[in-house]
A protein has these predicted regions:
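Charged, solvent-exposed interaction patches on well-folded alpha/beta domains
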Residues: 1-227
């Protein structure tokens, strides 16, 4: 994730802090120390209030931390626990504020596990704790393997397909994919050389009236079965 810090300001305040702490006046030093305690945490306002509140609750522990001694990784470790987040940028604003820009990940598919609907984010994480209002999301059935899904997604996208062009993805026990396209067209991909089959699939869809086709079987090398 991204971090953004004004280095010139850091150096200035570090020098200032060092000089002031060298003055042997405990009350004064205490005032200076408090001056650099975190008093404000600001989150970007492009996410819903419920999520903002949950993140604020977890970040409350950093109030009154000395801003110089707070490691950005400490904040990032908390944000990483929110699977709905796709990206964030933590910025220290001296002397006493944190500003965090947040953005949610795109949802690309969903599946069911023990009757619970689980979403898959573009960030590769499983998302369950938030209400999702995405439309036209494809479902995943059979074996659930996010790594294989993203590998297939990359190959489809390379040849002009998006995941939501399809209704359903089914990963067989053999790790071979079946795809449901336009509600009624079943595409059987081979176990190997998937990308070549996707090229063939693209050509078939472009050059044929697929309304009368129910199955495109590409499992056998150098053979296309339409039925």
């Amino acid at each position: 994730m991204h971090r953004s810090i004004d280095k010139k300001k850091i150096y200035f305040y570090l020098i200032l802090l060092t000089v002031l702490l060298s003055i042997h006046n405990q009350n004064f030093n205490y005032s200076i120390y408090n001056f650099f305690k975190i008093k404000k945490i600001e989150l970007s306002d492009n996410i819903e209030e419920k999520l903002n509140s949950q993140i604020y609750e977890k970040l409350n522990r950093f109030y009154n931390f000395n801003i110089f001694f707070l490691k950005s990784e400490e904040v990032e470790n908390i944000l990483d626990n929110f699977n709905i987040l796709g990206d964030y940028k933590v910025k220290k604003e001296y002397p006493s504020s944190l500003k965090i820009d947040l953005s949610k990940t795109n949802i690309i598919a969903y599946y069911f596990s023990n009757d619970q609907k689980i979403y898959i984010g573009e960030n590769g994480k499983k998302i369950t704790q938030f209400d999702i209002n995405y439309k036209n999301l494809p479902s995943i059935e059979g074996k659930i393997n996010i790594k294989k899904l993203f590998n297939l997604k990359m190959k489809l996208k390379k040849h002009g397909f998006e995941l939501n062009d399809f209704i359903k993805f089914y990963l067989n026990k053999s790790n071979r994919w079946d795809l449901l396209y336009n509600d009624n067209l079943l595409i059987r991909l081979p176990l190997n050389d998937i990308e070549s089959s996707i090229v063939i699939l693209k050509d078939i869809i472009k050059s044929n009236d697929i309304n009368n086709i129910n199955i495109i079987d590409l499992r056998i090398k150098n053979k296309i079965i339409l039925s």
